Each structure stands twice: as structure tokens, then as C-alpha cells.
Amino acid sequence: DALGTHTHGTKNLAGYIKKAHDGGVSLTAKPEILKQGSAYALIDGHAALGMVTSTFAMELACDKAEQEGVALCVVKNSCHFGAAGYYANLAAKRGMIGISMSNVDPNMTIPGARGMVIGNNPLAYAAPAQSTPSVFLDVAMSNVASLKVIQAKKDGKEIPATWIVDKDGVPTTDPSHYPEEGAMQPMAAHKGYGLALLVELLSGILSGGSTSMSGE
């Protein structure tokens, strides 16, 4: 919220509380390092809040990078972590280039398909700068954040035809199609799909965690 990204702030608090009550999130779990070397680590979040595990992972990556010049930490068994850019900026504040990403549940279609095929997996980077806080980018691989579609539905407003498709894969301006039967449109068509797949490989496969295809 402080960064102006209201779709990823306190607006999600009720959802986090419900998920905790339903057993999908542990409010007492602590991230555990399963395996590590001087410049890498594999972390199990044990279903803790994504903010807890992701902050732990980025701080650990920065600690290792201070010694080795570069480091990678991957996380499995985590939950929604909010805005990806927050964690990238943790590295920038320590004088480093930070990259953060996460795969999410399927909510986006891909060219030539119908329905939700893959997540709109967010990716962010931040680099320290002299005249500004950081050189910074935080984007999902859909044309717009899914929460903006949901907000438009609550407000009864139409949306641009580039945001979602209906159950037949046809672009629509009616937000009521999502998420019950429609899907998000990928940013720049196959390009957004390709980048979402990269995040899937690095976040889900590399960590040994869940992927969009885990339930198939």
C-alpha cells in the first residue's frame, strides 16, 4: 500500500485470514533451510505466510551474495507473497541487484487454448540508483493484475477487451466472466506466456515445489 500498489496490500488481509482459518496458511510456521551452499539455498516455507518466507529468502540471498558476489535462494511450500517488487527492493537497499518471482495458481490462458492454463506469474527486479530509490520493475505476465478485474466486477464497471477472455476464449469487456469461467490474457500474447513459463520453471520445478500442472 505504501508503494501505491493497493491491489497487493491490506486489501488481501481478509483472504489471508480466511485461508489461515481453513488451514491453508500456518501463522506459526517458520521457513527451514533444507539444503544450502555458499551461494545457494533451498527453503521450505512450511505453508507460512509468503511475506515471512520470501523476506527470509531474500535476506539470506543477500547475505550469501555479500560473500560470493551472487546468490540464489528458491522456496517451496509457500503462500501468496504480495508484491514481488518488495523483495527485489530489499536487495537494492543493500546495494545489490535483486530479482524476485513466483508461480501462482492457474489464472491465465495462453494462445490457442481456452480457460486457465498457467499462472500470470509475477516477476520483479530492482537495482540501486543514486538519484532515485532504485531502478525498479514489478509485473505479472497478464496484461493487468487479476485483482483489478475483480475490483471492476465489484464496482460494476466495464474493462478493456485486452484484460480477460470468456469461457470460449473470446476477449470480453465484461468482468463478471472472471474468475468463474474466463481467464486473464497474457501480456503480449506468446511473449507473456513464455515468460510465465520461465517463472514456472524457476519457482516451481527448480525448487521441487508445486506448479500449474501439479493437479493434472
Task: Annotate each predicted stretch with a short phrase.
Residues 108-177:
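Phosphate/diphosphate-binding glycine-rich loops and adjacent basic-rich segments that engage nucleotide
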Residues 8-62:
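Active-site cofactor/substrate anionic-group-binding motifs, chiefly glycine-
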Residues 14-18, 59-62, 89-92, 126, ...:
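Predominant activation on well-ordered alpha-helical scaffold segments within soluble catalytic domains
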Residues 171-211:
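Oxyanion-binding "anion nests"
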Residues 8-15, 52-56, 60, 82, ...:
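Conserved active-site and cofactor/substrate-binding residues in soluble primary-metabolism enzymes
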Residues 213-216:
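Catalytic-core signal marking the mid-to-C-terminal active-site face
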Residues 1-5, 18-25, 63-67, 93-97, ...:
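Generic secondary-structure signature for well-ordered alpha-helical cores
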Residues 38-130:
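A generic, well-ordered mixed alpha/beta core segment in the N-terminal half of proteins
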